[in-house]
Amino acid sequence: HATPVTHMRVQGDQDGEVHFDAAAQGVPALAWIVDVPALETRLQDAVRFQPQVELVQAPVPAALTVVCEGRASRTRSELGAEFDIAPYPQHAIATRMACEKPHGQVARQWFSPDGSILAFLPLSGEGGSTVAVVWSVAPPLAAELLALEADAFAQRMQAASQGALGTLTLASERATWPLQQAQARHWCGTLPTSPAAAWVLAGDAAHNVHPLTGQGLNLGLGDAQALAQVLGGRDAWRSVSDLRLLRRYERQRKTALAPMGLATDGLHQLFSRPQGPWQTLRNWGMKGFDHSGPLKDWMARQAMGTR
């Protein structure tokens, strides 16, 4: 259920291209694509064998409540945590496509002249010919694409992907949501109903980025790791609800998130500019970056989380 990404190809809206290669980085894979149902099943199995973890179906009193319900978190709103949102003029369409040609463990991305961004992520399966798709497009185009019959939708996607994987067939339902960059002003606080207890945000409940870099889940996992380290390293006498601990976690994660947020937003802004000088500049920049050596290696390590 986990598919290695051994190559990554990013194509601009003219002739700019960037290639990443796992072998060049000395690693077996640049990333791993995991099916959500498989990941959820494994997590459920793991929880069953953790005697200190109990699954509950209703709120229970606790010294610390970790709020990780997603970007539309109701609990975050009830706690009064302000969430600064900068909407993008795009909606994401997510689905799966069966491809005539095998994906070859290559992740592909296309930037179009109209600002649309199409990403193919390789999935496991017979023949290696299924990809997960995220297509970021303007809201009117999203509505148009979602209204198409399956065959017509596949033809539009085949054209947008320049026929890289041959004939495409829709292999799942289509989902859509509006895109935004967002971050909570404060990630932790005291529970209004219990001054001795605290809350803390993690994952999409704390921050959102554009999916063009494919880092959303990784950033959330980074939150979980950082929070576990801060709490696990506390003095024995200190409660997990100590706001000094939780603010340390908040500072660490905000610092870690800043470069990725700036890079993601910067790329989106650059490729959403009108054609003309901007189109020439960004494609020239892609070609220069592809031959930049140390800079390209540094960016690859950042994306892989190896730094």
What are these regions (language model features)?
Residues 229-307:
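C-terminal helical "tail/cap" subdomain of flavin- and related membrane-associated enzymes
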Residues 36, 40, 90, 94, ...:
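A general structural signal for well-ordered alpha-helical segments in protein cores
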Residues 33-37, 147, 221, 275:
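Short, solvent-exposed loop/helix junctions and linker helices
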Residues 141-231, 236-241:
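FAD/FMN-dependent oxidoreductases across multiple families
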Residues 79, 213, 271:
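Short, flexible helix/strand-to-coil boundary loops that buttress conserved ligand/catalytic motifs
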Residues 63-176, 183, 188:
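Conserved FAD-binding catalytic core of PHBH/FMO-like flavoproteins
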